Design a protein with these regions (language model features):
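Peripheral interaction segments used for macromolecular assembly
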Residues: 1-259
Length: 259
C-alpha cells in the first residue's frame, strides 16, 4: 500500500463530517459565551434579585481598543440601572408604569442608556467633537438652496410657539444637521435646548418648525447640555429619550389604547 493511502481503510468523508461537527459545536459555544459579555448576569426578580448566568458562564474581562486609543473592559462592574417604574400587576414580567414625570422616567419610548459615556462623540480624522453648532465651524454653512431655518418659530404639538431657532448643530463626520438650537420663550421658560431633526417638520412658507412629540410648555424640561458648544453621548441619549417619551406621555390621551 502506498504511503498516505488511508482512504482504503478510513472513511475520510465521515471523519471530515465529525470534525465539522466538533468545530461547529465549539463555534456555537464560543459565540454564545461572547454574547454574555454585556447584559449578564441576568437578574431574576422572582427570587429576591438572584443573579442568573446559565451555561456557559459569563466570560472573564476582555479589553476592546477604541478609536480614541482607550481600552474598554467587558464585562465590568457597573451600577444597576435605576428603574423609575412600578409593575402594574403582581405576576413576574408585568409591564411597568412610570413613576413621577413619565417624560423623564426613562420608561417605554422614553428609555435611554444610563451607562452611556458622558463625553462627546469624536470624528475619526481629527478626533474633535463630532456634533457642534454651526457658529463654531466656519468651514460649514447651510446651502443657499435650503430653507433659511434660522429665525423660524418653533411650535409644539398644541400649536403654541415655544421659541425661535437660533442655530443648527451639525455632524461633521456625516455632514448633516442633527439638531436645531431653540431659544425658548414663555410658556416654555428660558434658555436654549436642542430639537432633534427627526422629531420635527419644517414649514418654510410659514417660517415655522413644528414637532408633534411635546407641548410648547414641555420644552422647559428638555435635558440641557453641560457645554454650550458640545453635546455628550449621554446627553444625546437623554434628549432623544425626552422627545421619544412625548410620543406616549406628552398628553394623557396618548397613554390610552386606541380601541
Amino acid at each position: 500500500m502506498q504511503t498516505g493511502a488511508i482512504t482504503s481503510y478510513i472513511d475520510v468523508a465521515q471523519l471530515t463530517l465529525y470534525a465539522f461537527w466538533v468545530f461547529f459545536a465549539g463555534l456555537i459555544y464560543y459565540l454564545h459565551r461572547e454574547n454574555k459579555r454585556e447584559g449578564y448576569p441576568l437578574i431574576d426578580e422572582r427570587v429576591g434579585q438572584a443573579k442568573v448566568e446559565g451555561f456557559p458562564f459569563v466570560p472573564g474581562p476582555k479589553g476592546f481598543l477604541q478609536s480614541d486609543g482607550s481600552v474598554v473592559l467587558v464585562p465590568r462592574a457597573e451600577p444597576a440601572d435605576v428603574v423609575n417604574g412600578r409593575p402594574i400587576a403582581a405576576w413576574p414580567g408585568a409591564p411597568l408604569a412610570p413613576k413621577g414625570d413619565p417624560m423623564l422616567s426613562g420608561m417605554g419610548p422614553g428609555a435611554w442608556a444610563q451607562h452611556r459615556a458622558d463625553v462627546p462623540d469624536h470624528c475619526f480624522d481629527d478626533h474633535g467633537p463630532k456634533i457642534v453648532p454651526l457658529r463654531t465651524v466656519p468651514d460649514f454653512f447651510l446651502a443657499w438652496e435650503d430653507p433659511k431655518v434660522l429665525g423660524m418659530a418653533v411650535l409644539g404639538l398644541d400649536g403654541v410657539q415655544a421659541g425661535t431657532v437660533v442655530d443648527a448643530w451639525i455632524d461633521r463626520s456625516e455632514v448633516v444637521i442633527r439638531y436645531l438650537e431653540v431659544e425658548l420663550a414663555p410658556p416654555a421658560g428660558t434658555g436654549r435646548v436642542l430639537l432633534p431633526m427627526n422629531f420635527m417638520t419644517m414649514k418654510p412658507k410659514l417660517r415655522q418648525v413644528r414637532t408633534n412629540t411635546i407641548l410648547a410648555e414641555q420644552f422647559a424640561a428638555v435635558p440641557k447640555t453641560r457645554d454650550n458648544e458640545t453635546v455628550t453621548m449621554l446627553e444625546e441619549e437623554k434628549i432623544m429619550a425626552y422627545y421619544g417619551g412625548g410620543l406616549m406621555y406628552a398628553t394623557a390621551r396618548r397613554q390610552e389604547p386606541l380601541l
